Amino acid sequence: MMSLLLAIPAMALTPWKKGAFETNQYRNLLVEMGYTQAEVDAKVKEVFNDVFFGPNKVYFEVGDSMGYVSDVKNHDARTEGMSYGMMIAVQLNKKDIFDRLWRWSKKYMQHQDGIREGYFAWSCRTDGTRNAQGAASDGELYFITALIFASNRWGNDTGINYKAEAQRILNCIQPKEYTPERGGFGGFGGFGGFGGFGGGQGGQQANNQQQAPQKQKMYLIDPETKLITFTPDGFGQGFTDPSYHIPAFYEVWAKWADDGRSDYWYECAKKSREFLHKCVDQKTALNGDQCQYDGSEMQGFRFPGRPQGQQQGGAPQAPPRNGNNNFRYDSWRVPMNITLDYEWSCADGEWQRWYGETFQNFMYSQGVDTFMDQFRKDGTLPEGNEILGAGGFRKLRHSIGLVATTAAASMMCSHDKSKEFVDAFWKAKHEPFEDGYFDAYYDGLLRLFAFMHLSGNYRIIPPQK
């Protein structure tokens, strides 16, 4: 019998050509590849427990009704992790976890009044004290979508009116005028890991304290390009982050937010897909961590007050290579986000299949078990201070977070390489590196999301009958 099985050629993987908005069907690639349903169910449960309840968990409950997700190595809770936790909870029907995370987010992170009403402070200490006031736009993106799904799954009469909460955020993120605070960047404190988001003023005003503050506008979506901002106010509204682009989320808003903006959200989805074409390299499919709205690289990006180059021996030193144009931590999410849009909508299927295979071809050239976690867009490795540090280390690694998202891209691919990436991901262990570095938070969440994708458990949640 075994000899007969070995003689049968392996079935080629064939990406689906229609999205779940149309079919209401979800592909289980792991079962297609030969893993049993029982093995797949056990794996998803195991990885979920690792993130939420295991010895290296990042989810912590507070009292009888709240909880938070922490970037443990940076000792904070971020809108990224809180909204990811809510999305995971609604996907896996964990209502208690969802409600705890939302209550904590609303109490400590969300601005209830003032110029930032409805937005969320991107980082808080685990006691709820804010590290910064400003928002990072991807948090709002996930909060809104997760709340709409919660409304669709559980209704709005179990203690939290999820739809009303989503609609409030959607109303607050529309362009509004405000007068920035004097004294520099309101949310731009020197906080470990990022340096702060959401300044009260742009760089020009920060360098001229005598100038009276000019009225500015705050918005999650840039009105001119219809693309998501890096931050809704200050310096960050002048550019975007490719990893914040999840076009299918806008389609969820268009279908079920009931905010009177359906046509606008569909247009945002269209513009977001067009942007992704522009921001990736045509040979490697790599993108930069941040870029201009036209997809071009950041030019001279720096934090205000920090010099571009230094004088040495009387001669100006060339400015350092701009690491924000490199593929690194934020960028890991892009292949998985494009996978999500492919699975749910498939409105840009031909390009997305090209992207998936081009991206995996590049990673394959670097070694399935050895590819590094940061690259320049041309595929060369960054050097020195151009390497973005994490957890006290400035080092290139083979990180399981990128292993996860590279494997997730197999949902768009038909070449045999994709099987190798999935098998490598299945076998990969989430454990400390030899030098002690370990990221339970970001690596752990991306690992869980990827297994949800590959098992068909990351789904559109329509209103329940």
Tell where the protein language model's regions lie, with residue ranges.
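A cross-kingdom marker for long, charged
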Residues: 341, 393-397, 405-416, 420-465
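Long, hydrophobic/aromatic-enriched structural stretches that serve as scaffold segments
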Residues: 98-104, 111, 115-157, 172
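Inward-facing hydrophobic residues that define packing positions of alpha-helical scaffold repeats
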Residues: 102, 147, 163, 170, ...
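Extended ligand-binding clefts on enzyme/binding-domain cores
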Residues: 13-46, 53, 57-58, 72-79, ...
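Bacterial N-terminal signal peptides
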Residues: 1-9
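Alpha-helical support elements that line or immediately flank enzyme active sites
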Residues: 86-95, 105
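Hydrophobic/aromatic side-chain positions at a characteristic register within alpha-helices
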Residues: 90-93, 148, 410-414
